[in-house]
Structure formats: C-alpha cells, structure tokens
Amino acid sequence: MTNYHFVGIKGTGMSALAQVLHEMNHQVQGSDIDKHIFTEDALRAKGIPFFPFSAENIKEDQVIIQGNAFGDDHPEIARAKELDLTIYHYYDFLGHLADEYRSVAITGSHGKTSTTGLLSHVLSGITPTAFLIGDGTGAGVAEAKAFVFEACEYKRHFLYYKPDYAIMTNIDFDHSDYFTGIDDVVSAFQEMAMQVKQAIVACGDDEHLQNLQANVPILYYGFGENNDFRAENATSTPDGTSFDVYLRDDFYGTFLIPGFGRHHVLNALSVIAICQYEGLNKEEVAARLSTFGGVKRRFSETNFGSQILVDDYAHHPKEISATIESARKKYPDREVVAIFQPHTYTRLKSFMDDFATSLREADATYLCEIFGSAREQEGQVRVEDLQDKVPGSDILTRDNVSILRKHENAVLLFMGAGDIQTYQHQYENAK
C-alpha cells in the first residue's frame, strides 16, 4: 500500500485518479482551494480526505501527484522537493498506471468525457473494468484487466500514454493558449496515433482523422458511407435515439441510446466498434448502451416548476451547438434558452464569431461574466464584446437570475466550464 497525496485533488482528472487508487486499497488524501467544486462530492462520499493547501500537508512517507494547474513553486511541491519525495505529474502517473492494463484511451477535441463514460458503463457490465472519466469519476477494480481512461490533448499530455487501443472522436482547434492552429493540433494527434499498440477507432466523418497514419489498424465510424461502422436511420423516440448500424455493407444491428443528437450516436458507434473488434456479445453491448445514465455536467437535467434546467460543460462553439441540438430533439415543443459563461479570455477571443454563431441557434441567450483559469485571470476581451454579436442577448449576474422565470415551459441550458453552476443554484434558490 502506497500513501499518495494529490496537489489539486479537486481537478476532474485528479479526483478520478484519487478514487481509482483509493479503491485499489492505497492510502489517498489531497489538497485544494476551499471553494466548493462538484468533484469533491465523490471524494467525500468515498471517505477520501482533502485539506486546504498547506506545506504542512506534506509528510515524509508520501508519493506526490502534482495537478497540471500547479507549478513547482507551489508551497506543497516545494516542501515535497525539500523532503526529496517522489513527485509525479498527473499525466505521467496516469501513463504508468495504464501500462499495467489492457488499456483504452479516449481522446478528441470534443466528446471525450461522454465517450469514456459510455465505454466504461458498457464494459463494466460485461467484464471487470477500471476507469477514469474526466467528469471526476473513477473506479479501481481489483480483478480488472481492462482500463478505460480519458486522454487530454492539451499541451500534448496524451503523448505520455501508450495505450493498447485509442478512440479518437474528432480533431478541432481549441486551447489556443497552447496550440498555434489546427495543423498543430493535427500533428499532436498524429503523434498520439503512432503510440497506439493494437488498434485505433476513429471518426471517419472528421476530415482530419481521415488522413491519420498509424502502425496499427484504424477502424472508422460515422454517418458517411465509407466508414467501417456506419449509422443509418437515426430516429428520436421517447426513450432516446434509435439507429441502425452497418458493418461495411452488412446490417449489424439496431441500437438505442438514451441521449439525443448526432454526437451521441457517434459516441455510441465508437463504443460499438471497439466492442465488436474485441469480440464482445452484441446483445450485451446493446443492453448496456440503452441504460447509460450519462456523465456529470453533460446535459444533466433538473425539473424546476414548468422549466427544465440543464447543467452542461459546453465551453467551445461546437459543444454549444451540440447541446442546443440535444435540447431541441428531446424537447421539440419547448423554448431553448442559452445561459453561457465563457471560459478563459483566450478562448473567447479566439472563437468570438463562432461563439456568437452557436449561441444564435438558441431562442434566447444570456451571457455571464468571463471565468478565467488558474493560468489566466484577465485578458483583452469582455463578455460585452460577445453580447454585441448576439442580437437580443442579455448579461446575467447572480443578482438578476430571477429574470429567467419569464421563460415558462422552457429548457434553460446553463453552459460553461467555470462556475456556471453557481448561477443555476442561485436561480433555484432565489426568492
């Protein structure tokens, strides 16, 4: 048993990794800011202790897991260096852990977390599976031989991983504070592809993934006719989305997923493809797909009077469009209201026009103050700049959330990667 201390344990990946190690019977604790973050609820439920940041948290018998947002000048890291403790960055440790299993890395600019959650749910019902999901959920299973984990492309961290399999959902330009453009992103994914040891499952509808080179087989999935796994006849039903799957030219089966929207069908296709490649029972896979309850902060619904409140992590223009599409398909007779909090000044500046285009797809739009990051607390852009590009949009503050009451019978989409949840909570508790 090893004694682990996590510096920044409330991070989504860090929280999940802490749970994995805890369930493997290691001693786990961590530290973070005092502010409530949704990931801490799972830590508390599993009895994993966490404390405010302090150099006094660091003890001589610990192995330190350093969160990506914290540098070597952090007081806890500095203390760990003084004590000559073993220190791993999160992504480095995760790479070593994955090497101990038959591993599946899920990566892509969008859809990583939902796809990781879906594959984890399906496999866990068929064979013992450990998993790490980017919504802060993790499970360590003693008898597991498979490990499903989310692999983030930011700063090329996923190059620390050499998985047996990889699912690649799409390639898009994001993280403009690091990547220089789409070619730089494509280059990173190409490097990742060369490290996969068994097979890659990639979305063939994505123009960049179509040109992927690898030393292992690539199975393509999507709606396009040239894909190895192809979805047809996608239909919204009261229970979700039904669709037919063709394996090249042959009918493979009909599947039902609880989600709505093309992106959910694509996520399911990738899972179906890798399960078929591994020889898993098709009926068992279909049964598990139909019972997937989703992941945290991905179209998480709350009934609130006549309204439906949705909490969603969408923080990129394409993710906003996908969330709005899901709302329209699930609730075709309701008004769709977007409440969006931009996450980082750099991202807003880089995608200003795209954000405006996506938000105009809603029936009404409210904008919240920009949420910075640990690396970026201010910038050369204002939320009012986005408001100018979205006709009829309003600025929403925590003091005026009651204005949302006028949207009776509407679906209110609270979207963002910052603290947009505080606006929803304020609205739910407003007198």
Swiss-Prot record:
Residue ranges of coiled coil: none
Subcellular location: Cytoplasm
Gene encoding the protein: murC
Disulfide feature: none
BP terms from Gene Ontology: cell division; cell wall organization; peptidoglycan biosynthetic process; regulation of cell shape
EC number: 6.3.2.8
GTP-binding in keyword set: no
Binding site for ATP: 108-114
The species this protein was found in: Exiguobacterium sibiricum (strain DSM 17290 / CCUG 55495 / CIP 109462 / JCM 13490 / 255-15)
Keywords: ATP-binding, Cell cycle, Cell division, Cell shape, Cell wall biogenesis/degradation, Cytoplasm, Ligase, Nucleotide-binding, Peptidoglycan synthesis
The keyword Oxidoreductase is annotated on this UniProt entry: no
Metabolic or biological pathway, per its Swiss-Prot or TrEMBL entry: Cell wall biogenesis; peptidoglycan biosynthesis
Catalytic reaction annotation: UDP-N-acetyl-alpha-D-muramate + L-alanine + ATP = UDP-N-acetyl-alpha-D-muramoyl-L-alanine + ADP + phosphate + H(+)
PANTHER family cross-referenced by the UniProt entry: UDP-N-ACETYLMURAMATE--L-ALANINE LIGASE, UDP-N-ACETYLMURAMATE--L-ALANINE LIGASE-RELATED
One GO term describing the cellular component: cytoplasm
Functional summary from the UniProt entry: Cell wall formation.
The family this protein is said to belong to: Belongs to the MurCDEF family.
GO molecular function: ATP binding; UDP-N-acetylmuramate-L-alanine ligase activity
UniProt-recorded name of the protein: UDP-N-acetylmuramate--L-alanine ligase
